[in-house]
Swiss-Prot record:
Lineage, highest ranks first: Archaea, Methanobacteriati, Methanobacteriota, Stenosarchaea group, Halobacteria
Keyword Calcium recorded: no
Gene source species: Halorubrum lacusprofundi (strain ATCC 49239 / DSM 5036 / JCM 8891 / ACAM 34)
Superkingdom to which the source organism belongs: Archaea
Name of the protein described by the UniProt record: Large ribosomal subunit protein uL1
Pfam family, one: Ribosomal_L1
GO CC terms: large ribosomal subunit
Annotated GO biological process: regulation of translation; translation
GO molecular function, one term: rRNA binding
Keyword Repeat: no
Amino acid sequence: MADTIQEAVTLALDDAPERNFRETVDIAINLRDLDLNDPSNRIDESVVLPAGTGQETQIVVFAEGETAVRAQEVADQVLDSDDLEDLGDDDDRAKDLADETDFFVAEANLMQDIGRYLGTVLGPRGKMPTPLQPDDDIVDTVNRMKNTVQLRSRDRRTFHTRVGAEDMGPDAISDNIDVIIRRLEASLEKGPLNIDGIYVKTTMGPAKEVPV
């Protein structure tokens, strides 16, 4: 499968019109034979890409004490319980934060307050924080999430995810796609039989089918 993925990626990169900006590379995934009105059939998976995402990933950490101090080294923002309460009183600011942030991480003891103050904002966006367990290292967790993408179908048969940037080259992008396909197949009831098609493209380029 790796060779056919690489062929599709190479075609997508070669056929993309030259632009004066750095294009991202995405895949579109089409599902079939699934009742996506049933939430249990929907895809919602975090996947760590072996070659990275090729872009900055915005991560916000809710933490206090030593964890907050260490998180300052790697996170884009570190917020404490007072900040959390302030966000709960400012719906516009909370929505802006949710829209600008790729992933949230929170100490487990703050999750209840996050649900109370931000649940109605983060929940519908699929951005409730990943709970940080007592033995988890915040620096390792954030660094791993910087290379993470979210596969999220919601109730749609077609959904998209980022797999890299054009200047990463076919090998790295193909490795990322291979990992995503394997995770996707493992998540689907009938594996590859539930996949109707996968297409790879740059931001402005033509889509090329990835054989599965």
